[in-house]
């Protein structure tokens, strides 16, 4: 692309004055010189004389006329050149796309490789929040990465693994089946990370997570309720075709229940088990139209004692539904919430030991969210946890003087569609950059992104300055999208013509044509160990995938990886950390009571 033209408004009058000065000087010199016309012209064109007497100017008519004529002539020449010039772009007539090289990625990389985010075998991105800014370019990019690759294309091996082994961030990972925990959990422990595990697959091994521990006010209640109602559906992604009164009624009821538990119960009772206890109190004490439930009586008392109660007001909204509609809402919400009746779920949600706030500290912390790959029944809890994580970390950053987390925080979201929907995620991903938070979103295909966030997928895509295509399967729509994203290049096509008659001739000519940098078919048949990388504002890269074994820290995977996560080792490490933080020890003498 041609460089933008400079503003000529200042230079045109300056050039006119200089031309007038030159013409005036030449005219005055011509008048002062005696001799033949040739001799006088030679004197007027003598540059040495111009340098010796630059201010030999005159206001007589001849000299003024020469000055004006010179300025006008220069103006005419400029206009002729300007309007007769062709806007040629040699070798770019049909497109200027090209492959990026080492010189293109160099300004985006940190000299210390440990401070980079690996993208491919040869390209990486500095995690520095302040990159170089020049007159021609700004090398700051957000650190969000979106990855597309079908099953078996190396999403964990070539992307998630290398990024984890940098040990330059705190991490929140979605981990289908728990493979990342098994491969890297002990590795992170060996590097001093505090490893937290929310395990929805093997729940007896999970740290406890109580969503009430991260609720501060009514705003948080609204956000959590919206998330639960959305993700407790059989298909959270599907657009509801039912009457909106059902979902709105469930939302109002659940807001009332959560609000009551949060504001009216003791801290140790604030959990989803208490919400389920209240929900079971909805059973009416009769079959008549005026029958009431124990929950009705409870909220009637609350309305009398605390008329401005948020929970009481939301319950009144729910009670505006007609009797049969309200009963249907009760049953629907009860069925959706039934997962909380499972003892193992009730147990891990009863209290909180996971302490999500610690992710925003200076400590080295990693959180693995393990989900089963054979069912999505419990993914709603993962969706709520991820949303609360985002909110908590943004809040921590906003209360710091520099408005940033003390340590870069990366969400490594493998198989991102499987955790359901995070409401307003398109807003979150566009605002977390300034807090030093970033996401690596991993999808099997572009269609997954479009299905997950139907109306907002483009916003999410555009807020990821880096895109890695590990493979595109055979979907023509996906292949066409990536081909167009790479752009078109201008190539030369050779045409030959041969005449074998008595006056035989042979001609050869070249013609410029446009061609995709990679056609859809070329992307489909791309070798398995190669990938495409596109960084905003930079020529795309056709590079080898990152081979995890080439990482400088891979020896740690060989030593620690592939083994079941060592919970005992984690407990010992946590105890050692506790002891190291003890600042004062006092001895207390206990005396047994003498009953004699």
What does each model-found stretch correspond to?
Residues 47-53, 64-119, 218-228, 274-285, ...:
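Short alpha-helical interface patches
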Residues 1-153, 157-162, 499:
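Basic- and hydrophobic-enriched, low-structure N-terminal and domain-boundary segments
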Residues 141-437, 452-453, 462, 521-545, ...:
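P-loop NTPase motor domains
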Residues 9-12, 101, 518, 547, ...:
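Sequence-pattern detector for short linear motifs
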Residues 102-111, 121-137, 157-158, 326-332, ...:
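A broad, low-specificity signal for short, low-complexity segments enriched in glycine/proline
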Residues 111-115, 380, 416, 473:
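A short glycine-/small-residue-rich loop at the edge of a beta-strand within enzyme catalytic domains
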């Amino acid at each position: 692309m041609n460089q933008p033209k400079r503003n000529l408004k200042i230079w045109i009058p300056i050039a006119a004055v200089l031309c007038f000065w030159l013409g005036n000087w030449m005219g005055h010199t011509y008048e002062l010189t005696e001799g033949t016309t040739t001799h006088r012209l030679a004197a007027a064109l003598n540059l040495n004389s111009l340098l010796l007497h630059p201010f030999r100017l005159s206001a007589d008519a001849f000299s003024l006329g020469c000055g004006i004529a010179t300025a006008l002539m220069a103006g005419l020449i400029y206009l002729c050149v300007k309007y007769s010039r062709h806007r040629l772009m040699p070798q770019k007539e049909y497109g200027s796309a090209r492959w990026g090289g080492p010189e293109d990625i160099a300004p985006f990389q940190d000299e210390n490789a440990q401070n980079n985010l690996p993208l491919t075998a040869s390209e990486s991105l500095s995690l520095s929040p302040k990159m170089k800014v020049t007159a021609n370019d700004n090398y700051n990019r957000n650190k969000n990465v979106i990855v597309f690759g079908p099953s078996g294309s190396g999403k964990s091996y070539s992307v998630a693994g290398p990024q984890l082994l940098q040990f330059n961030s705190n991490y929140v990972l979605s981990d289908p089946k728990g493979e990342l925990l098994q491969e890297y959990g002990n590795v992170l422990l060996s590097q001093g990370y505090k490893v937290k595990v929310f395990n929805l697959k093997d729940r007896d091994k999970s740290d406890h997570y109580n969503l009430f521990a991260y609720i501060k006010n009514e705003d948080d209640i609204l956000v959590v309720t919206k998330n639960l109602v959305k993700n407790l559906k059989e298909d959270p992604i599907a657009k509801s075709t039912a009457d909106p009164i059902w979902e709105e009624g469930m939302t109002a009821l659940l807001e009332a229940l959560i609000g009551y538990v949060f504001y009216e119960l003791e801290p140790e009772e604030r959990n989803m088990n208490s919400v389920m206890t209240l929900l079971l109190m909805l059973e009416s004490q009769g079959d008549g139209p005026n029958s009431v439930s124990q929950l009705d009586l409870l909220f009637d008392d609350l309305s009398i004692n605390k008329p401005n109660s948020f929970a009481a007001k939301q319950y009144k909204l729910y009670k505006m539904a007609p009797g049969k509609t309200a009963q249907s809402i009760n049953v629907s919400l009860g069925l959706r919430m039934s997962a909380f009746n499972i003892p193992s779920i009730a147990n891990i949600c009863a209290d909180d030991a996971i302490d999500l706030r610690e992710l925003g500290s200076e400590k080295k912390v990693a959180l693995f969210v393990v989900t089963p790959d054979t069912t999505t029944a419990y993914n709603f809890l993962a969706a709520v946890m991820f949303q609360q994580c985002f909110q908590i970390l943004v809040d921590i950053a906003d209360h710091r003087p520099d408005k940033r987390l003390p340590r870069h925080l990366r969400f490594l979201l493998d198989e991102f569609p499987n955790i359901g929907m995070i409401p307003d995620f398109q807003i979150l991903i566009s605002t977390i950059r300034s807090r030093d938070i970033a996401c690596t979103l991993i999808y099997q295909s572009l269609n997954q992104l479009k299905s997950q966030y139907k109306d907002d997928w483009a916003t999410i895509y555009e807020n990821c300055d880096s895109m890695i295509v590990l493979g595109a399967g055979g979907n023509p729509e996906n292949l066409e999208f990536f081909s167009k994203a790479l752009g078109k290049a201008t190539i030369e096509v050779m045409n030959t013509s041969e005449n074998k008659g008595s006056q035989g001739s042979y001609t050869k000519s070249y013609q410029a044509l446009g061609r995709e940098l990679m056609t859809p078919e070329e992307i489909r048949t791309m070798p398995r160990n190669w990938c495409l990388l596109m960084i905003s504002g930079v020529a795309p890269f056709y590079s080898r995938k990152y081979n995890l074994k080439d990482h400088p820290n891979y020896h740690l995977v060989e030593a620690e990886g592939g083994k079941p996560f060592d919970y005992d080792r984690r407990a010992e490490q946590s105890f050692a950390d506790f002891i190291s933080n003890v600042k004062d020890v006092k001895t207390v003498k206990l005396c047994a009571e003498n009953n004699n």
